[in-house]
Design a protein with these regions (language model features):
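Juxtamembrane transmembrane-helix boundary motif
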Residues: 1-17, 27, 31-33, 37-39, ...
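Membrane-embedded alpha-helical segments of transport systems
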Residues: 53-61, 86-87, 94, 185-193
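A small-residue-rich subset of transmembrane alpha-helices
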Residues: 54, 182-198, 208-220
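Small-residue hotspots at the loop-to-helix junctions and early N-terminal turns
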Residues: 44-48, 180, 184
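Hydrophobic/aromatic end-of-helix segments at the C-terminal termini of transmembrane alpha-helices
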Residues: 31-32, 160-164
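ABC-type ATPase nucleotide-binding domains, specifically the catalytic core motifs of the NBD
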Residues: 173
Length: 255
């Protein structure tokens, strides 16, 4: 496999993953894993490890951008993160026992459906409505939801981004920017844990693919997060929906 082909595949995967992360708090695994598996014939477990590693910096720089614009709920984010992390390791170990084809397809389909939801039924919750929810109720919900997300995160190799965005907007009643900001904040840590456990169980991945994917995802996540924080809620819902639908269709088509 020539270095140029590796670079092109990883760069294009990084564009999709970065835009998905910066706009929607989507895990890079939903895009990077299927592309590496399909076009570079990479084993699924190795591809997921690279995708999670790409997630770490992309999510961190996105979380910083959202936090700087006061679109981040750190208190509940930490609560959810602890329960997510506890179950990421469990999911990752079980994933190592599962055949290649089972992994990835679930997250791709979910990406597409969530994109359609944002276009058809946008999240227009305001920060005032969001802050009116009882803190104790939100705490309990955050713990329960975190356990579910953590297991799925480790199992399908997603930083749980789509699950978190869906739960933060639909179950916990967050407005979209705060939901994405909180999602990428949590994902920074879940993806790091997932990547470390993947590399510990499966060994180090292809170094060049890792470097290319991390660099491209980081660049495009930064661009998307800066745009998202300046956009109006209606524009952001539409942009998020379109990005998710295009990525979902593109990856399903590639498979």
């Amino acid at each position: 496999m020539t270095m140029l082909i590796k670079f092109i595949v990883c760069f294009i995967a990084g564009i999709g993953a970065g835009l998905g992360t910066g706009f929607a708090g989507m895990s890079a695994a939903a895009v990077i894993s299927p592309m590496l598996i399909t076009f570079l014939d990479m084993p699924a477990y190795e591809a997921v490890g690279i995708a999670l590693a790409s997630d770490v910096l992309a999510s961190a720089v996105s979380a910083y951008t959202y936090g700087k614009n006061k679109n981040l709920d750190i208190r509940n984010g930490v609560v959810m993160m602890v329960s997510v992390l506890s179950f990421t390791m469990v999911g990752s170990w079980i994933a190592s026992q599962v055949p290649n084809s089972t992994m990835g397809s679930f997250s791709v389909f979910m990406t597409f459906l969530l994109g359609v939801k944002f276009i058809v039924k946008p999240v227009m919750t305001t920060k005032n409505a969001m802050e009116a929810v009882d803190p104790k109720k939100r705490f309990v919900q955050s713990v329960i939801c975190g356990v579910m997300i953590g297991f799925i995160c480790g199992f399908i190799g997603a930083g749980g981004g789509m699950m978190m965005l869906l739960i933060l907007t639909s179950v916990l009643g967050y407005e979209l920017k705060t939901a994405v900001g909180t999602s990428v904040f949590i994902m920074t840590f879940t993806a790091f844990t997932g990547a470390v456990s993947h590399f510990a169980i499966g060994g180090m991945p292809n170094l060049w693919c890792l470097v290319f994917c991390v660099g491209s995802t980081l660049l495009w996540a930064r661009i998307a997060a800066r745009f998202a924080n300046k956009a109006s809620p209606a524009t952001l819902n539409r942009a998020t929906g379109v990005v998710l639908v295009v990525l979902g269709v593109g990856v399903m088509g590639g498979n």
